[in-house]
Amino acid sequence: MLELNFSQQLGDLHLQVATDLPAQGITAIFGLSGAGKTSLINVIGGLTRPQQGRVILNGRVLVDAEKNIYLPPEKRRVGYVFQDARLFPHYRVRGNLQYGMAASMRGQFDAIVGLLGIEPLLNRFPFTLSGGEKQRVAIGRALLTAPELLLMDEPLASLDLPRKRELLPYLERLAQDVNTPILYVSHSMDEILRLADQVVVMDAGKVRAVGGLEEVWASSALRPWLQREEPSSILRVSVIGHHDRYAMTALALGDQRLWVGKLDAAEGNSMRIRINAADVSLALQPPHSSSIRNILPVKVAECLDVDGQVDVKLAIGEQWLWARITPWARDELGLKPGQWVYAQIKSVSFNRQNGPVPD
């Protein structure tokens, strides 16, 4: 558990944070430039000192301003990956990886190198590497210090699109294969959708929302960032099985079943799906014959008027599904909170696939 309760004045920015974050998975720190994202992780990493408050990691006090406790960065067991890789130019990749390597990680050197796909780079100097390769080496170096927490400050920000696409799969593998919690600073919605388990939304130095990706995505906290995008839903599902006749896979969405095109995924695997609100239509009764395979009972939670359209928030088990319809359709259906209707889902996309769901 990472316990944060501190304040810091940085020029015009007043950083004020009071929240607890889980010591597992990837937690995205999201917000516009100047929101305080990097300032937050700099306090955790020991690069700056807050004027008030405490920072506690897994029961260890990293900061207690009242007692004048500021643990030095090298004693915090916190790894840091910057926007620029900051490799030692006079060391080969192997030397960079071994610099600061914890004795307990010597036996895992080959595994980390393999995970990040940097074995072919071990004898090369940093100036011969691409931006994506440098960042993979920087991540490996940070992991080999045996950190209890890994901080990543927009590691893709300085990369062009091809290099971002090159690095993202490795970050996804980190989320699945490395048991080190990661705080991942980003202002990219696409990165958050692919990588994050939890999300912290920051604005003007303050935490505006904290929670699981699906929960925060469905809330109003991200609405200012989503105004230019088509609204959508992020849902967590698991594989039930595959159709014995058609190339279709059944997914469990709460206690309901969702059919999608056949996936190369084993029964029990969990994943996140994204459904655009425009791909969800509503009906008061289930149609008797339809080409749409997914027609699910849902409960209306609220209706929001947005730019001449109506966004309908629907409860489906313990998760939320958005539909975008016209005011005419809302009035004709007589939609109101608490009403049961049928959601017809026309299209589904996928964000991230994980291993089997634990019992």
Curated annotation (Swiss-Prot):
A single GO cellular-component term from the record reads: plasma membrane
Q: Name one Pfam family in it.
A: TOBE
Residue ranges of every copy of the ABC transporter domain listed in the record? 1-229
One function term, GO molecular function aspect? ABC-type molybdate transporter activity
Instruction: Look up keyword Cell inner membrane and say if it applies.
Output: yes
| InterPro entries xrefs | AAA+_ATPase (IPR003593), ABC_transporter-like_ATP-bd (IPR003439), ABC_transporter-like_CS (IPR017871), Mo/tungstate-bd_C_term_dom (IPR008995), ModC_ABC_ATP-bd (IPR011868), Molybdenum_import_ModC (IPR050334), Mop_domain (IPR004606), P-loop_NTPase (IPR027417)
Topology relative to the membrane: Peripheral membrane protein
- Where, in this chain's numbering, is ATP bound? 31-38
Gene3D superfamilies assigned:
2.40.50.100, P-loop containing nucleotide triphosphate hydrolases
Tell me the PROSITE patterns matching this sequence: ABC_TRANSPORTER_1, ABC_TRANSPORTER_2, MODC, MOP
Task: Report the EC number(s), separated by commas if there are several.
Answer: 7.3.2.5
Recorded catalytic reaction(s): these are: molybdate(out) + ATP + H2O = molybdate(in) + ADP + phosphate + H(+)
Indicate the segments forming the Mop domain, all copies.
289-354
Where in the cell?
Cell inner membrane
Annotated keywords: ATP-binding, Cell inner membrane, Cell membrane, Membrane, Molybdenum, Nucleotide-binding, Translocase, Transport
Q: How is the subunit organization of this protein annotated in UniProt?
A: The complex is composed of two ATP-binding proteins (ModC), two transmembrane proteins (ModB) and a solute-binding protein (ModA).
Function, as annotated, reads: Part of the ABC transporter complex ModABC involved in molybdenum import. Responsible for energy coupling to the transport system.
Which NCBIfam families does the UniProt entry name for this protein? modC_ABC, Mop, PRK11144.1
Family, similarity comment = Belongs to the ABC transporter superfamily. Molybdate importer (TC 3.A.1.8) family.
Q: What is this protein called?
A: Molybdenum import ATP-binding protein ModC
